[in-house]
Amino acid sequence: MSGDILVGEYLFKRLEQLGVKSILGVPGDFNLALLDLIEKVGDEKFRWVGNTNELNGAYAADGYARVNGLSAIVTTFGVGELSAINGVAGSYAEHVPVVHIVGMPSTKVQDTGALLHHTLGDGDFRTFMDMFKKVSAYSIMIDNGNDAAEKIDEALSICYKKARPVYIGIPSDAGYFKASSSNLGKRLKLEEDTNDPAVEQEVINHISEMVVNAKKPVILIDACAVRHRVVPEVHELIKLTHFPTYVTPMGKSAIDETSQFFDGVYVGSISDPEVKDRIESTDLLLSIGALKSDFNTGSFSYHLSQKNAVEFHSDHMRIRYALYPNVAMKYILRKLLKVLDASMCHSKAAPTIGYNIKPKHAEGYSSNEITHCWFWPKFSEFLKPRDVLITETGTANFGVLDCRFPKDVTAISQVLWGSIGYSVGAMFGAVLAVHDSKEPDRRTILVVGDGSLQLTITEISTCIRHNLKPIIFIINNDGYTIERLIHGLHASYNEINTKWGYQQIPKFFGAAENHFRTYCVKTPTDVEKLFSDKEFANADVIQVVELVMPMLDAPRVLVEQAKLTSKINKQ
């Protein structure tokens, strides 16, 4: 494939080659001409899917990328892109590959320094691009066609390999500049550079020796094992060694939780006591993809000895106190699978503790109330293999730790960035990615609190517009629970308008009769009846469930985390 091609057409064709089917975002005067080029890709499944606002679009791009592996969002210069920056920053923090395309004023207008609308009135057209440099792995503006293809390829390659957002600014005339199409016939380089053989062998030798000498080895899986695509290697490592394996909150769904070797969730000092004792007494910790944020570690309360630790990261390794830069964990894991002796590993593998939390009624509440310690273990029974589950910052993010997932569930949350309202936009991106995938029958399930819902509810409208069919659980507990637990238990600033008619949401947003179902559950009996309803479980239309829970009830881990956070905030 050679000859000339329009810059915008080249960009969209490359995205289509990388598996992106839907372009998210909001139209604006500086990106309209660029959007006209989407149809030139030539694939009827490659399309524009607009969002209700740019922030929701950025959240949706995050959710789409977590299911699909990559996503793209188009915004307009200044007002549009800054509306999206919170969502893009979240993707940067959480290692999610999002291509952010910004329609900018034309190159000719930029050269004049005109006081154009959507600017700060200072003639500087790179101000917003400079802002995004802090939350992007790579930033470029296409100002000519000569090297446009190479710049676009570099940006897309970095986005994928670094698993972080990139920024591509395209002036309104630049999308129609002519570029070479010759690269379209070549596959983008998406693999990490191979490790230095001598350094790699030294790392392998050290790890092998530690495994031989270990008596109580364990494996701990975290977020970056998922983000940097080593889950297949991790599964093979668990299968080979039989070592007890744990996940962090951000590592939920990284491994098969039906495995006999899955042993629970580690959250530092607020972990289940048996999990805490088992992992903190290890003499060999294989930590894969760690992202040690406060909510992911029980406010940094890990009690693990560095002298017993091997840390696997996307671009470096740490063995005990020695750092090995520029050593990619993917290749180390593949090499380990070849050199470790299975029978030797099996002889060191202790039996798991049988991690399985049962539903129980919370102290101080009636058995007719739906409490978190009852609901989340029961919710595990409702989940099916291959479900996509999105949980909101707050009670849902912590409650889901009490679920033991079926095989191949994809869990999406935002534990590090923690922007409330994220989950609704991410749900739309996720259900759209499922629709675009080879498995469009997978269920997409959202659990969101009433307070968070009020920030981003309009993206449910976009689901209805495109006939997407998520199951949406709304926790109706009268306001901001996590904030109340941290500070201001009865403060007015943690209150919201509690008079919303949740049963009216689909109809209000235009869902046709017989194309939606709504439910309100107030007791455990209501929940059990709903979960046994085959029509509900089939998810053949969009469904909204109002889940009424006590105002101050919360998952155990959240209660403990809130105490730690409150203490830190007062330091």
UniProtKB/Swiss-Prot annotation:
Its cofactor is Mg(2+); thiamine diphosphate. GO terms for biological process: aromatic amino acid family catabolic process to alcohol via Ehrlich pathway; glycolytic fermentation to ethanol. GO terms for cellular component: cytosol; nucleus. GO terms for molecular function: magnesium ion binding; pyruvate decarboxylase activity; thiamine pyrophosphate binding. Pyruvate binds at D29, H118, E483. It is an enzyme of class 4 (lyase). Keywords: Decarboxylase, Lyase, Magnesium, Metal-binding, Thiamine pyrophosphate. Binds 1 Mg(2+) per subunit. Binds 1 thiamine pyrophosphate per subunit. Mg(2+) binds at D450, N477, G479. Its EC number is 4.1.1.1. InterPro entries: DHS-like_NAD/FAD-binding_dom (IPR029035), PDC/IPDC-like (IPR012110), THDP-binding (IPR029061), Thiamin_PyroP_enz_cen_dom (IPR012000), Thiamin_PyroP_enz_TPP-bd_dom (IPR012001), TPP_enzyme_TPP-bd (IPR011766), TPP_PDC_IPDC (IPR047214), TPP_PYR_PDC_IPDC-like (IPR047213). It catalyses: a 2-oxocarboxylate + H(+) = an aldehyde + CO2; pyruvate + H(+) = acetaldehyde + CO2. Thiamine diphosphate binds at T395, G418, S419, I420, G451, S452, N477, D478, G479, Y480, T481, I482. It comes from the Eukaryota. Belongs to the TPP enzyme family. Homotetramer. This is Putative pyruvate decarboxylase C13A11.06. It comes from Schizosaccharomyces pombe (strain 972 / ATCC 24843) (Fission yeast).
